[in-house]
Amino acid sequence: MADQNNPWDTTPAADSAAQSADAWGTPTTAPTDGGGADWLTSTPAPNVEHFNILDPFHKTLIPLDSWVTEGIDWVVTHFRPVFQGVRVPVDYILNGFQQLLLGMPAPVAIIVFALIAWQISGVGMGVATLVSLIAIGAIGAWSQAMVTLALVLTALLFCIVIGLPLGIWLARSPRAAKIIRPLLDAMQTTPAFVYLVPIVMLFGIGNVPGVVVTIIFALPPIIRLTILGINQVPADLIEASRSFGASPRQMLFKVQLPLAMPTIMAGVNQTLMLALSMVVIASMIAVGGLGQMVLRGIGRLDMGLATVGGVGIVILAIILDRLTQAVGRDSRSRGNRRWYTTGPVGLLTRPFIK
């Protein structure tokens, strides 16, 4: 045992070995934190969040966003070639309209459109169309207006081809109408921007995807008003046609559709206006025309460029609205005159008609 009164006495070997191993005199007691884990790399225990009845929607309860994303990814992976095949007829018809409208010299196109307006709605509308189209060309928006007109006419054509037979079928099948009507409600209330993301993923960008998204956005009115027009045909006329032995085909084409034509044309008018309202939104996916002018003007803070595009859209909308309203007039309001006896066509055919 070492003498405690002798300052020169040596410490035990165990103590000297401990001091040589730890020059700073750190205590050598065993750690009590459960295995000596490094406090720099250790993560704290997660706090368990309990459901709070006063704030029930603090966390997402239904992961709708992930479901939709996974669903669209699955559709893109498995059905993208199918949707790329849908592009073919749309692209073909759109290119045909663009070549027709852009291939004609502007003066020839203005005269042709003015004559068509005269034939459909009278000489006053013909003059208004002439002046309006000259104004579009004068402000420097002629080519963009023709591109927009081609896009709108293509979308309108497909809406009529799809919507008119579908409306006739739903008018004859109340059970199917109950199933389709909520879908039409959802299509009409969904914001237009929502359609852009899946359309871009399935079809890409450009004019053809712009036409597709316009068709989807503008389709419900023509379906709804076709159903309404056929259902509003007086029941006594239907009974009279049946009593005279009319077949279902004859009843449809000679009784129901002619009487429902004003309402159907109101649906065409609404579809056309929705298609024009989609022009600026569709320009966000690289769709050309007047909407692209408006978008570029907004992006550059160029009020003049945006105004030119906006004025062009307004003029086109007014012309097309008046023309579709004129087509939708009841034939009885025009009397017994045939279409080929009025307007510029009547000037050519009148000498040959007794």
From Swiss-Prot:
Main location: membrane
Ranges of the Cytoplasmic topological domain: 1-99, 143-148, 220-270, 322-354
GO molecular function terms attached to this record: amine transmembrane transporter activity; carnitine transmembrane transporter activity
GO BP, one annotated term: hyperosmotic response
Superkingdom as given in the UniProt entry: Bacteria
ABC transmembrane type-1 domain boundaries: 145-324
InterPro entries noted in UniProt: MetI-like, MetI-like_sf
GO cellular component labels: ATP-binding cassette (ABC) transporter complex; membrane; plasma membrane; ProVWX complex
Record has Nucleotide-binding as a keyword: no
Membrane topology according to the record: Multi-pass membrane protein
Signal peptide: none
Transmembrane region(s): 100-120, 122-142, 149-169, 199-219, 271-291, 301-321
UniProt keyword list: Amino-acid transport, Cell inner membrane, Cell membrane, Membrane, Transmembrane, Transmembrane helix, Transport
Subcellular locations according to the entry: Cell inner membrane
Pfam families according to UniProt: BPD_transp_1
Disordered: region residues: 1-41
Low complexity bias spans: 13-32
Periplasmic topological intervals: 121, 170-198, 292-300
Biological role stated in the UniProt entry: Part of the ProU ABC transporter complex involved in glycine betaine and proline betaine uptake. Probably responsible for the translocation of the substrate across the membrane.
PANTHER family the UniProt entry points to: GLYCINE BETAINE/PROLINE BETAINE TRANSPORT SYSTEM PERMEASE PROTEIN PROW, GLYCINE BETAINE_PROLINE BETAINE TRANSPORT SYSTEM PERMEASE PROTEIN PROW
Subunit structure: The complex is composed of two ATP-binding proteins (ProV), two transmembrane proteins (ProW) and a solute-binding protein (ProX).
Record-linked NCBIfam families: PRK10952.1
Family affiliation: Belongs to the binding-protein-dependent transport system permease family. CysTW subfamily.
Record-given protein name: Glycine betaine/proline betaine transport system permease protein ProW
Organism lineage string: Bacteria, Pseudomonadati, Pseudomonadota, Gammaproteobacteria, Enterobacterales
